[in-house]
């Protein structure tokens, strides 16, 4: 089964680095706690075209379960409904771990 990447975007002005760090560190404990619900990683986004996050989930099912329950909360907190883009990811390359995976299983890649 593939992992699922969800890109969440809010059409809001770019925040200062200080605001972005404060926002990320204040909500990071919530996302750390979602490991039990299938969240593998979250990256906070901040740029000229808006703010948001990139979420890597263990499955689309896990991602849909969480976002379905939380989309209204996110819209209320930011004052605008986010745009969500969904992707299946079959082959992640992780240079921090030095591995390539296919559907969750490490494979040996020969150059």
Language model region names:
Residues 1-50, 60-68, 83-111:
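Short S/T/G/P-rich N-terminal loop/turn motif that feeds into the first structured element of a domain
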Residues 52-56:
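A short, exposed loop/beta-hairpin motif centered on an aromatic-Gly-Thr core
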Residues 71-78:
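A common structural junction motif
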């Amino acid at each position: 089964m593939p992992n699922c990447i969800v890109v969440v975007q809010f059409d809001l002005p770019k925040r200062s680095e200080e605001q972005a760090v404060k926002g990320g560190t204040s909500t990071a404990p919530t996302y750390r706690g979602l490991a039990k619900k299938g969240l593998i990683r979250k990256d906070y986004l901040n740029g000229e075209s808006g703010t948001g996050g990139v979420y890597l989930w263990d499955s689309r099912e896990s991602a849909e379960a969480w976002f379905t329950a939380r989309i209204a909360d996110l819209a209320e907190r930011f004052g605008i409904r986010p745009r969500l883009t969904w992707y299946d990811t079959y082959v992640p390359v992780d240079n921090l771990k030095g591995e390539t995976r296919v559907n969750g299983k490490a494979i040996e890649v020969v150059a």
